[in-house]
């Protein structure tokens, strides 16, 4: 199909965040959410052992459907999402061929679920919460994770002046690596030693977007752009942005029109475009209510 025959979404970059950690859904809210996702996703979310994980997964699915409904103007109940063999969600069905360059990705960890979407670029997003490791010391934790980073990256992590700053730099590097892996959709089989990040600046301010970090793949500097932002003093978000091959020489890019920052959505924002796709299932609420929010060990550590 020729490019001129394809639709390009009239949108800029999208950055949304939802505080799923503090979200305490009512019975009506949770049952409405269950009606607004695909049956297989409803079932998958219902199998989580803890409500924290179920809420995060539900928020992620709703964010994906919202961005497609709002930005591509596809009715919510006509959106069909599938996963690649490596687990990356994508839009399928008749509408997907009309917007072949539209990309989106979600991540949830800590207190937030986040979404990044682009009209004409590859995108991967990851969020990491800086927190103390469970039962091991920071040094033991770093030892166990030694193979995930290059020597230069470990030098950057260990150069920080206290344990918390070192842990924070660790999770910053981790989010960067995960954002790239998610953008290219290769899953867990990718050797993380092949990619190396040169982070800049060392210190970040909350709410400010940074684009100075560089990535090297097999020792060669790449042209990918990495956006970084601190949502608060514990949550670091990294967004990997790469060119779609057949659009590399087109200018200007829609996604470069405006600076992108994260918009914090509330539950009403999240559901404003939602259209239920199934009947209400009261047992789904009973199942949700029967679960603990967190594992016992994590509840004690708070």
Curated annotation (Swiss-Prot):
Where on this chain does CoA bind?
Answer: 44, 83-88, 105-108, 178-182
Q: Which positions bind Mg(2+)?
A: 126, 178
The answer, when asked if Cytoplasm is one of the entry's keywords, is yes
> Chief subcellular site?
cytoplasm
Q: State the free-text cofactor note.
A: Binds 1 Mg(2+) ion.
Where do the TM regions start and end?
A: none
Q: Do you know which Pfam families this protein is assigned to?
A: AASDHPPT_N (PF22624), ACPS (PF01648)
Q: Which UniProt keywords apply?
A: Cytoplasm, Magnesium, Metal-binding, Transferase
Catalysed reaction(s) here are: apo-[ACP] + CoA = holo-[ACP] + adenosine 3',5'-bisphosphate + H(+); apo-[ACP] + acetyl-CoA = acetyl-[ACP] + adenosine 3',5'-bisphosphate + H(+)
What does the record give as cofactor?
A: Mg(2+)
GO terms (molecular function) for this protein are: holo-[acyl-carrier-protein] synthase activity; magnesium ion binding
Name the InterPro entries for this protein: 4-PPantetheinyl_Trfase_dom, 4-PPantetheinyl_Trfase_dom_sf, AASDHPPT_N, P-Pant_transferase_sf, Ppantetheine-prot_Trfase_dom
**SUBUNIT field:** Monomer.
Family, similarity comment: Belongs to the P-Pant transferase superfamily. AcpS family.
Name of protein? L-aminoadipate-semialdehyde dehydrogenase-phosphopantetheinyl transferase
What organism is listed for this UniProt entry? Xenopus laevis
